[in-house]
């Protein structure tokens, strides 16, 4: 399985791809929010071993990821969006548990 994490920002997106075994495929691919940038991502996704599942994830920003979502849907890629507030609460809650145990 491939895990694709995309950092969403106002002017560009940054992509990280790894396998379930921890092999890094792409460490920091900067994608412009243009057709060319999205095609760069699509070509990278298509170059991956198609026998493996691809899991694409990013934080929901409300607006900045809209073009990316439409592009992924149009090209038959599913994705998961995470609420950044919930992610932050989850992380801080788990870090608290670790601190308490130590």
Model-derived features: positions:
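Phosphate- and other anionic-substrate recognition elements at nucleic-acid/protein interfaces
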Residues: 1-102
């Amino acid at each position: 399985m491939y895990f694709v994490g995309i950092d969403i920002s106002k002017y560009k997106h940054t992509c990280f791809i790894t396998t379930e075994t921890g092999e890094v495929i792409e460490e920091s691919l900067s994608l412009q929010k243009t057709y060319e940038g999205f095609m760069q991502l699509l070509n990278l996704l298509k170059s991956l071993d198609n026998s493996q599942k691809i899991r694409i994830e990013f934080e929901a920003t409300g607006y900045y990821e809209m073009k990316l979502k439409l592009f992924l849907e149009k090209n038959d890629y599913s994705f998961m969006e995470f609420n950044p507030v919930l992610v932050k609460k989850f992380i801080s809650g788990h870090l608290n548990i670790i601190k308490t145990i130590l």
